[in-house]
Every structure is written in structure tokens, then in C-alpha cells.
Amino acid sequence: MSGTEISSAGLEPRRRRALYQAWHRGMREMDILLGKFADAHLATLTDGEMDEFENILNAIDRDLLSWMTGEAPLPDEYNTPVMRKLMAFHDHDGPINV
């Protein structure tokens, strides 16, 4: 089970691959954090934003989780509009709906 709530059928290969990578990480927590964001935003990202998202997908899961939870500072190379959008997408006081 991928967890995704959208169909990849209408997506171009680049976006389909990114959707798969977002939902199939090494850590279930990152599957949820990246996958939910991809479900909500992947279809509308510009080509430049896709470059940024693919860079995020290439990062190590433990590092991503540390940055997103504030346990470690976000490196400049990842401090991009898409990363800030991803972090804002999950910035709330209640539990994450899975």
C-alpha cells in the first residue's frame, strides 16, 4: 500500500516518480510527511519547484525529519520556497491526520 490519496495516472513521468519517492521512504514518518505534501501540491508545482522538491527527496530521511521538527537547523541549500512550503504544510498544534 502506497498511502497516496491521488492517482498517478494523469501525471507526467517526472511527477509520477516524485510521488512514488515521496511515499516510499526509509522511514514511515517521512512517507507521511512527504507523501501528504506531494498528494496536495505535486500536480501544481512549477518546473523550478519540482527541481527543489526532487532535491528534498534526495536528502537523508533522518536529516529531513530533524530539520522539520526543529531538532537541527535547516541548511542553506535546503532553505528553499518548497521546503518552507513543506514545513508550513505540517506546522500545526494538533496531531497529523494519517
Predicted regions: what they are:
Residues 2-98:
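Positively charged, polar, low-complexity stretches
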